[in-house]
Amino acid sequence: MNNHFKCIGIVGHPRHPTALTTHEMLYRWLCTKGYEVIVEQQIAHELQLKNVKTGTLAEIGQLADLAVVVGGDGNMLGAARTLARYDIKVIGINRGNLGFLTDLDPDNAQQQLADVLEGHYTSEKRFLLEAQVCQQDCQKRISTAINEVVLHPGKVAHMIEFEVYIDEIFAFSQRSDGLIISTPTGSTAYSLSAGGPILTPSLDAITLVPMFPHTLSARPLVINSSSTIRLRFSHRRNDLEISCDSQIALPIQEGEDVLIRRCDYHLNLIHPKDYSYLNTLSTKLGWSKKLF
């Protein structure tokens, strides 16, 4: 065993037997290598592991040096919002579909992870967004997002009228089905489907992408990630929501505004040494191959 990582957390919410098999393989392999291993409580229960150290995501974030997330991007997003609050590195084994955030191939994960544990990896910091639903002199409702914060109707799709302020300066008003506010990490997710630009992860930028705007002039807008975005609503309704990574919903009540800004903390994401963001885009999005 080396000194790069001493305590490793195993994280994920398995949805099919093959994912559970990967969790079990990973646990037993790390134990034979002499690492201290903390298994997320739900995984330990489903695998019926005995005499194993278990913990919540927060406890893994506090105690472990590295968290290995087994699953798809959805599992990674759910875990990363909590793990980003702590000084822990995170890597993923892909047991989902595209796997933009989960680099390791499940068929070769053991060898790839062995190289990472020997210190052969690259690291990067991915910033998160913080969304606040607030009204003057009232308690705020707050959540965070790795990919995007989305304004949308709560139940039935309909046009929303709202105003956008950037650093408290009026930017534009819009009638649309909603608005996607995305990080560079989320620029290959929901934002991309709505016609937003792809941003490389190192950019300190946020994109604002309209959803089906009732105009031909609305276009995605890219702003500095240090900016604060305020959403105000011209016709008060009580059926609007803000969703974070399509996993957490915050209802918007009459008279409330929405504030979106960059979080104070980052996700410490690591990759195998041969990782290339552009190669990932080409592979996942089916871009054309080189001509010569």
Swiss-Prot record:
Write the record's keywords in alphabetical order, separated by commas.
ATP-binding, Cytoplasm, Kinase, NAD, NADP, Nucleotide-binding, Transferase
What is the predominant subcellular site recorded for this chain? cytoplasm
Instruction: Determine the domain of life of the protein's source.
Output: Bacteria
Question: What is this enzyme's catalytic activity, as reactions?
Answer: NAD(+) + ATP = ADP + NADP(+) + H(+)
Looking at the UniProt record for this protein, which Gene Ontology cellular component terms does it annotate, in alphabetical order?
Answer: cytoplasm
Q: What's a Pfam family in this record?
A: NAD_kinase
Q: What Gene Ontology terms describe what this protein does at the molecular function level?
A: ATP binding; metal ion binding; NAD binding; NAD+ kinase activity
Residues reported in the UniProt entry to bind NAD(+)? D73, G74, N147, E148, H158, R175, D177, T188, A189, Y190, S191, L192, S193, Q247
Q: Where is the active site?
A: D73 (proton acceptor)
**EC supergroup of this enzyme:** transferase
- Any GO BP: NAD metabolic process
Report the function annotation for this chain.
Involved in the regulation of the intracellular balance of NAD and NADP, and is a key enzyme in the biosynthesis of NADP. Catalyzes specifically the phosphorylation on 2'-hydroxyl of the adenosine moiety of NAD to yield NADP.
Its protein name is NAD kinase
Organism of provenance: Shigella dysenteriae serotype 1 (strain Sd197)
Q: Which gene encodes it?
A: nadK
